[in-house]
Curated annotation (Swiss-Prot):
Annotated propeptide span(s): 33-59
Keyword Signal (UniProt): yes
Subcellular location: Secreted
Organism (species): Homo sapiens (Human)
PANTHER family per UniProt: SERINE PROTEASE 42 (PTHR24253:SF159), TRANSMEMBRANE PROTEASE SERINE (PTHR24253)
Enzyme nomenclature, EC number: 3.4.21.-
Gene assigned in the entry: PRSS38
InterPro entries in the cross-refs: Peptidase_S1_PA, Peptidase_S1_PA_chymotrypsin, Peptidase_S1A, Trypsin_dom, TRYPSIN_HIS, TRYPSIN_SER
One of the GO biological process terms: proteolysis
Pfam families: Trypsin
Signal peptide: 1-32
Protein name: Serine protease 38
Length: 326
């Protein structure tokens, strides 16, 4: 998650100026769902606690590490003991992430999920560690686009214990439009184009970008598919970065937070003119709900084991000149 220096892309100065003006003047819109329960927005996949309602209130200041309990649904996905991706808590047994985070290795025993974690080096009082029971990748993953269908459902072996630091997020679906939404991305990705990392969970406020402008920025209609959405602060050169993959993009609506996107791909942090591209949660919401409903709960649930954190974040990928997974 970085705010790199501005660069001039393939657009000319006049076209770029017009585009930036339109991005500022035109309020972004994105489809999202309003749940039918009183005073709650979005789909809740658990009945035990309210979704999207962190216990910590107040305004967040951009450019600083995220405070504890601000994003209680944040998950750290570990592969062979290292943080590689983010995710979000849906309910007591399910985590939402990106399919490409699990494509590298089909052996689910090598993956672990950490919740209630803010610092990758230090387990907090509410940090919990869970083993993976199964991973379900969307059937269209990489079918029509090199990184399309980039959604994964992760079922845990044991039940998540909710607390002020560990809570589920609400899911967005297509029934209601969010206009000029207050949206934030969170993760432990790179914090600069030089490859610097942070042990602290990072947060970044990002405006949503209308689909036509995202097509224009990427310069080719086939890059952005209907199952994707775009977000990025082009004027201030802010975007998600390598290592943020699978993490949530959430928007506030009536004091509830709806997850509208899953960090998926982009041109990398070195080129801020290209916004981050996210898997659209509203597009996949029915598939998510259907799979959670039909999948049996693991037998004999047991308490989570005590967390034992491995090395700090290690993002072992090169900055690609073209599009890349994040």
């Amino acid at each position: 998650m970085a705010a790199p220096a501005s660069v001039m892309g393939p657009l000319g100065p006049s076209a770029l100026g017009l585009l930036l003006l339109l991005l500022v003047v035109a309020p972004p819109r994105v489809a999202a769902l309003v749940h039918r329960q009183p005073e709650n927005q979005g789909i809740s996949l658990t009945g035990s606690v309210a979704c999207g309602r962190p216990s910590m209130e107040g305004k967040i200041l951009g450019g600083v590490p995220a405070p504890e309990r601000k994003w209680p649904w944040q998950v750290s996905v570990h592969y062979a003991g290292l943080h590689v991706c983010g995710g979000s808590i849906l309910n007591e047994y399910w985590v939402l992430s990106a399919a490409h985070c699990f494509h590298r290795d089909k052996n689910i025993k090598i993956y672990d999920m950490y919740v209630g974690l803010v610092n990758l080096r230090v387990a907090g009082n509410h940090t919990q560690w869970y083993e993976v029971n199964r991973v379900i990748l969307h059937p269209t993953y990489e079918m029509y686009h090199p990184i399309g269908g980039d959604v994964a459902l992760v079922q845990l072996k044991t039940r998540i214990v909710f607390s002020e630091s560990v809570l589920p997020v609400c899911l967005a679906t297509p029934e209601v439009n969010l206009t000029s939404a207050n949206c934030w991305a969170t993760g432990w990705g790179l914090v600069s184009k030089q490859g610097e990392t942070s042990d602290e969970l990072q947060e970044m406020q990002l405006p949503l970008i209308l689909e036509p402008w995202c097509h224009l920025l990427y310069g080719h209609m086939s890059y952005i598919m209907p199952d994707m959405l775009c977000a990025g602060d082009i004027l201030n050169a802010k975007t998600v970065c390598e290592g943020d993959s699978g993490g949530p993009l959430v928007c506030e609506f009536n004091r509830s937070w709806l997850q509208i996107g899953i960090v998926s791909w982009g041109r990398g942090c070195s080129n801020p003119l290209y916004p981050g591209v996210y898997a659209s949660v509203s597009y996949f919401s029915k598939w998510i709900c259907d799979n959670i409903e039909i999948t049996p709960t693991p037998a004999q649930p047991a308490p989570a084991l005590s967390p034992a954190l491995g090395p700090t974040l290690s993002v072992l990928m090169a900055m690609l000149a073209g599009w890349s997974v994040l």
